[in-house]
């Protein structure tokens, strides 16, 4: 029947999703009634008058860019490894690579650390739009938290015991947050990644207002090519990969997904680094 905590969390998430749908419906209904008042508001006019960011670089409009090729190459290699790794590689390689706290998870933590360093350096050196600098600083902090989460805050590196607070609510008995309450935090991470990495770039590309809004508040948004990379990474689950290939190695799909998402965020950091250099 599965873990009771996971089942309880799943029921809660379904109820929360229904609630969000009702809220979204209410907001949409309100906008449809008072849209004239909204577009005449000073806030809307201020956002609409912002120049946006597509005029700065056409690179973010490209689909087949470096971010697309790198993220999809990583995804393709991951699928090939799952399908054929057990046939061509010895267990002395596949076992430490795929186990919990193995090489893949350690590499994911290293990539998140690089992301944090890149964003911290960008925030330190950037002297332009203040909101942009604030988001760069926030991203640097968030990715540093991701490093701690991937390493269970040093639990396996330094041999810490699982905290008493985590016992019974962490499904893997680890000192981290993303495995609490039946993977609820992990599900939030997946949903947040898909919204930020896929939905926001599409809104930005399709509607000039969203481009101006994101630019006005200083939010870095992935390119269209990277959005497809986020989509492929976020859809890497047992129920999707299992349809494509038969697994030949011991490797958690969740660990592979986190690794691919880490690569996508690294490409985002490099896109920001390139974009902020442009005049």
Predicted segments — roles?
Residues 30-33, 227-279:
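C-terminal transmembrane-bundle signature of multipass membrane proteins
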Residues 124-144, 210-224:
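Interfacial segments of alpha-helical transmembrane regions
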Residues 144-164:
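Transmembrane alpha-helix/helix-exit interface in multi-pass inner-membrane proteins
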Residues 18-26, 64-82, 226-230:
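Alpha-helical transmembrane segments
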Residues 35-64, 206-219, 279:
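Membrane-interfacial, low-structure loops and terminal tails that flank and connect transmembrane helices
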Residues 2-11, 91-94, 168-183:
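Juxtamembrane membrane-water interface segments that cap and precede transmembrane helices
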Residues 2-4, 81-94, 204-208, 235-248:
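Juxtamembrane "helix-exit" motif on the non-cytosolic side of transmembrane helices
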Residues 11-23, 173-196, 261:
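Hydrophobic alpha-helical transmembrane segments
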């Amino acid at each position: 029947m599965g873990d009771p905590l996971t089942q309880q969390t799943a029921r809660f998430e379904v109820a929360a999703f229904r609630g969000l749908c009702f809220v979204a419906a209410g907001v949409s209904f309100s906008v449809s009634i008072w849209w004239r008042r909204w577009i005449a508001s000073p806030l809307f006019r201020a956002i609409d008058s912002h120049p946006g960011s597509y005029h700065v670089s056409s690179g973010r409009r490209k689909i087949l860019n470096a971010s697309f090729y790198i993220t999809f190459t990583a995804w393709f290699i991951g699928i090939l490894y799952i399908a054929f790794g057990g046939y061509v590689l010895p267990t002395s390689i596949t076992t430490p690579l795929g186990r919990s706290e193995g090489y893949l998870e350690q590499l994911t933590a290293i990539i998140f650390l690089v992301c944090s360093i890149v964003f911290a350096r960008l925030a330190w050196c950037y002297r332009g739009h203040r909101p942009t600098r604030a988001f760069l600083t926030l991203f640097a902090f968030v990715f540093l938290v991701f490093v701690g989460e991937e390493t269970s805050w040093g639990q396996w590196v330094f041999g810490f015991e699982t905290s008493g607070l985590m016992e019974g609510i962490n499904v893997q008995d680890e000192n981290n947050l993303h495995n609490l309450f039946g993977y609820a935090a992990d599900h939030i991470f997946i949903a947040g990644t898909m919204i930020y990495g896929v939905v926001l770039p599409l809104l930005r590309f399709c509607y000039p207002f969203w481009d101006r809004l994101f630019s006005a508040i200083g939010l870095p948004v992935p390119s269209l090519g990277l959005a497809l990379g986020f989509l492929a990474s976020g859809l890497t689950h047992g129920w999707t990969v299992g349809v494509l290939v038969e697994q030949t190695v011991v490797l958690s799909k969740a660990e592979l997904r986190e690794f691919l998402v880490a690569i996508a965020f690294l490409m985002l950091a490099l896109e920001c680094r390139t974009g902020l250099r442009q005049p």
